[in-house]
Amino acid sequence: MSSYLSIYIVPKRKSEGEEKKHILVAAFSRNSEIYQYFNENIHPAYNGNKEHPYTTITKDRIQDVITDLSRDISSSKDRLMEYEKYAKDNPDYIQEIIELKQYISDLQYTQGEVCFIEDMIDSTDFYEEIEEVCCNID
C-alpha cells in the first residue's frame, strides 16, 4: 500500500462558519526522506481520521524536523571523517565513503526542501490570504 505525505495551504476564510479549503502544494511518497522526517517529528494525521484529518505545521514543529535533519547531517559528516581517516590503510572503506557522501548530499537536499516549507509557514504572518499550512498522510 502506498501512502503520501501531502502538504496544503489553507486560504483565509471569509467567515468563521465557512469550511476550510485545503490546496495541495506538495506530496511526498513513503520512501521520501521528507515523509520519514515529518512522520517521526510531526506525526501527521491520517486522511481517514474524520475528526482530525489534518495536522497544522507550526513553526516549532517544522523546526523540530530541521533540527533532526541537522543532527543527522552532522553525525554523518563526523562518520565520514572517521571513514576517510581509516581509508588510507584500508581501501575497503572507499565504497562506504562514496555512499556516505551521497547520503549526506541527499540529506542536505531534503533540508533545503524542508526549509522551503518553513518559508511557507513563515509567510502566513505576512500574507493575510493564508490561514495555515498543514499536512496529512493519504
Predicted regions and their residues:
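Acidic (Asp/Glu-rich) sequence patches and key acidic residues
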Residues: 1-138
